[in-house]
Regions:
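Transmembrane-helix bundle of Major Facilitator Superfamily
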Residues: 2-170
């Protein structure tokens, strides 16, 4: 009587102890997506209050919004190269740390210039975080679980814009 173990490569979810649930990787990436998606709507509604604290008009802070979006647009194409070159896990971890720290420092910014620079740094993290996170989930999720994993990644994009305005001071 042979007691051979099943091939782990055929059923990675079973090997990790997760049978039909959502993978930890998908949940972690979904949380990162939520942070990035909520960020835009929180800041957009907080701009008037931020402008008062900086002593400028709200329009002056639009440069921070534009700097973030431009950084995303320029660096997203490099995210695939970075994941291949340095490893998706390393890039995602780096991006998550950069994005989170830049978000915290944005909240503590004392000038418009500081805010804009921190938004650029935050954009660097965001540009790497979302595409590399999605790539990681797609590469590590078994085919039968792919729809559930993609749904897990989609929910933050739907919920965060609803929660952002009240959190930002709507």
């Amino acid at each position: 009587m042979s007691h051979s173990k099943p091939d782990v490569s055929e059923h990675p979810q079973e090997a990790s102890g997760v049978n039909s649930g959502i993978s930890v990787i998908a949940l972690l990436v979904a949380a990162a997506f939520f942070m990035e998606f909520i960020d835009g709507t929180v800041i957009a509604t907080a701009l008037p209050q931020m402008a008062i604290s900086f002593g400028v008009s709200a329009v002056d802070l639009n440069a921070g919004m534009s700097a973030y979006m431009l950084t995303l647009a320029v660096l997203i194409p490099a995210s695939g190269w970075a994941a291949e070159r340095f490893g998706a896990r390393n890039v995602f971890t780096f991006a998550l740390a950069v994005f989170t720290l830049a978000s915290l420092f944005c909240a503590m910014a004392s000038s418009v210039s500081e805010f804009i620079i921190l938004r650029i740094i935050q954009g660097i993290g965001g540009a790497l975080m979302v595409p590399v996170g999605r790539l990681t989930v797609l590469k590590t999720t078994p085919k039968p679980q792919l729809i559930k994993a993609i749904a897990t990644l989609t929910w933050p994009a739907l919920v965060a814009p609803i929660l952002g305005p009240p959190l930002g001071g709507f």
